[in-house]
């Protein structure tokens, strides 16, 4: 595992406990076959040659268990992309490069995946952890979000306990709300609302934002509008600083 130890004796014990619980959750993720046809667990692609000791490759890039902010995406992609990139998040992904600009706007200076060492500063994960079998743009099934939400997404958020959970896109937002059985609002209203949703008992505040991939940037929400959306996250994050 790449998670650094820090702090005094009590802090070391708490960190060790977090690491142990996280690794146990990762092992359950690797063994999961709940969704069946349409999804493939990274642990079986090329006999697990490109899988990682994290909830997924996005968490391998940013997997700090004490992160103040967690980003939840929809899914990582499909089997073909995973094999082509040998299981690594790419430096050239429009989603990744734009996300780093948005995070920089609220004070987080992160590096691209191949330039990142250690477990990073934040925690990234996806609402669906397995890989699509029929192409990156293929449809996703509601039960995939339900299965992953209760088995992995909620336990991961409760383990990390970030101050803020940023939901990247409507499906990620609905997955988080569904994992807590909280009624989701209309997405635009949720994005533009001055109020966040509090997740009990961990106390994380949920902020949905539009996806920052090329298609959404070019059609639904341009970069300038997304920067404005992220400003409210920055204000909340730095209250009391």
Positions of predicted regions on the chain:
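Intrinsically disordered, glycine-rich low-complexity segments
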Residues: 7-10
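Basic, amphipathic alpha-helical patches used to engage nucleic acids or provide basic targeting signals
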Residues: 193
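A polyanion-binding, active-site-adjacent surface
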Residues: 16-188, 196-217, 222-239
